[in-house]
UniProtKB/Swiss-Prot annotation:
Marked site (Involved in auto-cleavage) residue numbers: 334
Transmembrane segments: none
The UniProt record lists the keyword Signal: yes
Native organism: Drosophila pseudoobscura pseudoobscura (Fruit fly)
EC numbers: 3.1.-.-
Lineage: Eukaryota, Metazoa, Ecdysozoa, Arthropoda, Hexapoda
One Gene Ontology term from the biological process aspect of the record: cell fate specification
UniProt keyword annotations, A-Z: Autocatalytic cleavage, Calcium, Cell membrane, Cytoplasm, Developmental protein, Hydrolase, Lipoprotein, Membrane, Metal-binding, Morphogen, Nucleus, Palmitate, Protease, Segmentation polarity protein, Signal, Transferase
Compartment(s) where it occurs, according to its Swiss-Prot or TrEMBL record: Nucleus; Cytoplasm
One annotated Gene Ontology cellular component of this protein: cytoplasm
Family designation: Belongs to the hedgehog family.
The name this protein goes by in its record: Protein hedgehog
Binding residues annotated for Ca(2+) 2, in chain numbering: 158, 194, 197, 199
């Protein structure tokens, strides 16, 4: 009877490995009755010997399965990362041809003396105010990074390598632009004639002195290309672009300190989520595997498993947006985070960046009486600076925090595209949950071993990879820059 009960159990799980089936058969063997012809002492000795051998064999099978799990995890990650390259959606085409495909929308060159945006360079909507000149002996000099991109030519007239130094944001945008230039004009490379300047060759108020500006041209010095070069610079994400002269283009960016508050999307650690057990926990205490209240694709509340943390840092200081509703709910979230906004006139639910939610907009809030998600009007939008960031990712891609429905995603202005981009992590989590040795290994952990959530400090490697690649595959209008 025991054997008949065990076989269907293994057959009911078609993905169970041979190791798990072997362990079941070994368990059955371990508990078989000893023959009556054998003496009691011999029987005990034989059974003890069998038990020790079986325990050793089981541990070997568990270790083998764990190795297979690790290899499968690595293989699936590689395959799933390569999979999107084979069918890039039309809306994912970025500057130039974008992953081997020509862009499907027309880009119009700038005209001489045109600037984008049409604002003063030092306004908040452009590159922002000056923060002070950086010299070699300044504390901020260590924040400048060299750019050794082989696809970029640096004139470096001074011979000091100063033209290679710039802020991290400037380097990031310049590398994207270099990629676009090569795709737009094969055989032509981006030329940087000036970056960080320590010789005061510019006006008194110049972002060159802070490493936040570059003067660029093309390697062939063809003036007819410069209008389109300026347009490509806009698409690459520069915060202010000016077709200042027929000889070059001027570009600048916001300071690294001013944009650090919204490069990723997170909640405050003290914000709370409701678990399926009915317990409300701060996000700082949520662990991978917890099932928390989320919102399904139909707008109804569902409980969804936390599969990873896209960002988790309890010490980092960050700027947040505060959304207050007429029902008393308060959501504190980073500016680039996507929030579900209900449009009653259209009976439609959209996802909007938190810093673009306005008063009189409606957000979905959990009704404590019925448990349903109901629209509540936003009555005040504020800002606060607080310590710590936490960004859990659920299988649904949504989470209800402080009773307000929000996305798990940020930076990209599309809930569906962001959810599609994290599909490899959901598949990976599902595969890992099928591994037969996982529960056995977890049960062997001692109480002193901290959880994966407690061990993580910083941005998840996959989320960070997506953030870095977004500028190459998405147009600027799809990004929170």
């Amino acid at each position: 009877m025991d054997n008949h009960n065990e076989v269907p159990m293994s057959m009911s799980v078609p993905w169970a490995s041979a190791a798990s089936v072997t362990c079941l058969s070994l368990d059955a063997k371990c508990h078989r009755p000893c023959p009556s012809s054998i003496s009691a002492s011999a029987s005990a000795s034989a059974c003890a010997s069998d038990s020790a051998a079986i325990a050793t064999t089981k541990l070997r099978h568990i270790a083998y399965t764990q190795r297979c799990s690790s290899r499968l995890t690595m293989l699936m990650t590689v395959l799933l990362l390569l999979l999107p390259l084979s069918f890039t959606p039309a809306h994912s085409c970025g500057p130039g041809r974008g992953l081997g495909r020509r862009r499907e929308r027309n880009l119009y060159p700038l005209v001489l003396k045109q600037t984008i945006p049409n604002l003063s360079e030092y306004q908040t909507g452009a590159s922002g105010p000056l923060e002070g000149e950086i010299k070699r002996d300044s504390p901020k000099f260590k924040d400048l990074v060299p750019n050794y991109n082989r696809d970029i030519l640096f004139r470096d007239e001074e011979g000091t390598g100063a033209d290679r130094l710039m802020t991290k944001r400037c380097k990031e945008k310049l590398n994207v632009l270099a990629y676009s230039v090569m795709n737009e004009w094969p055989g032509v490379r981006l030329l940087v004639t000036e970056s960080w300047d320590e010789d005061h060759q510019h006006g008194q108020e110049s972002l060159h002195y802070e490493g936040r500006a570059v003067t660029i041209a093309t390697s062939d010095r063809e003036p007819s290309r410069y209008g389109m070069l300026a347009r490509l610079a806009v698409e690459a994400g520069f915060d202010w672009v000016s077709y200042v002269s027929r000889r070059h283009i001027y570009c600048s960016v916001k300071s690294d300190s001013s944009i650090s508050s919204h490069v990723h999307g997170c909640f405050t650690p003290e914000s709370t989520a409701l678990l399926e057990s009915g317990i409300t926990k701060p996000l700082s205490e949520i662990s991978i595997g917890d099932r928390v209240l989320s919102m399904g694709s139909n707008g109804q509340p569902v409980y969804s498993e936390v599969i990873l943390f896209m960002d988790r840092n309890l010490e980092q200081m960050q700027n947040f947006v505060e959304l207050h509703t007429d029902g008393g709910a308060v959501l504190t979230v980073t500016p680039a985070h996507l929030i579900s906004v209900w449009h009653p006139e259209r009976q439609q639910l959209d996802y909007v960046f938190a810093d673009r939610v306005e008063e009189l907009n409606y957000v979905l809030v959990r009704d404590p009486q019925t448990g349903e998600l109901r629209p509540q009007r936003v009555v005040r939008v504020g800002s606060v600076r607080s310590k710590g960031v936490v960004a859990p990712l659920t299988r649904e891609g949504t989470i209800v925090v402080n009773s307000v429905a929000a996305s798990c995603y940020a930076v990209i202005d599309s809930q569906s595209l962001a959810h599609w981009g994290l599909a490899p992590m959901r598949i990976l989590a599902m595969l890992q949950s099928w591994m037969p040795a996982k529960d056995q290994l977890r049960s062997s952990q001692t109480e002193g071993v901290v959880s994966r959530a407690e061990q993580q400090n910083g941005i998840h490697w996959y989320a960070n990879a997506l953030y870095k690649v977004k500028d190459y595959v998405l147009p600027k209008s799809w990004r929170h820059d």
